[in-house]
Amino acid sequence: MKQYDAVIIGFGKAGKTLAAELAAHDWSVAMVERSDKMYGGTCINIGCIPTKALIHSAGLAAAGHPLTFGQRRDYYRESVASKTALVDLLRDKNYHKLADNARIDVYTGEGSFASPETVAVKTTQGTQQIGGKYIVINTGAETVIPPIEGIAQSRRVYTSTSIMELEELPQHLVIVGGGYIGLEFASMYASFGSKVTVLEGFAELIPREDRDIAAAVREALEKKGIEFRIGARVESVSDTAAVSYTHLRAHETGAYL
């Protein structure tokens, strides 16, 4: 079993920075990352970089000449491809910043504790154990899926991560939740050309922000054609051949692809 001064579980911002710093001080380091799509962490792969790349492209679409929906759909597909190429480039650079360091070994697999000083890494080739004087957990978090009837069975329900892989521009997109992430995606897809409806279960949007800020944000988004339904409690989601319907207490909305 190979021994290291430090084993870091999670190739995110904190983990990669710590690994490089420890290696610079002559520590031997093992970096364990479950997914080869997450080298570098959230910001590079599923957060800041891809969202801002798409927002930039969406802004160009909104500022240009009027386009048919078919033209917008083609442009959106090109924008997703451009975003993916950028993310792939940055992910590769992040990987090699650590993997090319002689004092760092990168393991692509799921890490778990075999003992207080031992990490078992499950890879496609099997499971191996590595030891560390220090073990650092830098695993981040996963998306919370609300317990809404039919949501797990729907083929057209996306998270803020999975929707950025969607290559078909929705004609109508329903966003459940009026927090800052939901509103960021609402603005983006409205600029690309989708009809967007935001459903917020509470009495106001972005409740942690000052009310004048929230009012200004809502006004700006409504000018883009975004529809808001405040106090809308989603009871269930159901699919037809081409549409996912979001059922509210007294209303029904459609998300069209």
What are these regions (language model features)?
Residues 2-4, 21-27, 33-169, 197, ...:
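Glycine-rich flavin
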Residues 10-15, 140, 177-182, 252:
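Conserved phosphate-binding and hydrolysis motifs of nucleotide-dependent enzymes
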Residues 104, 178, 226:
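Hydrophobic patch in the ABC ATPase nucleotide-binding domain
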Residues 232-234:
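Flavin (primarily FAD) cofactor-binding/catalytic cores of flavoenzymes
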Residues 168-201:
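Rossmann-like NAD(P)H-binding beta-loop-alpha module
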Residues 6-27, 185-190:
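N-terminal Rossmann-like FAD-binding beta1-loop-alpha1 element of flavoenzymes
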Residues 2-12, 171-176:
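Beta1/beta-strand and adjacent pyrophosphate-binding region of the FAD-binding site
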Residues 246-253:
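Conserved small/polar residues in nucleotide/adenosyl-binding loops
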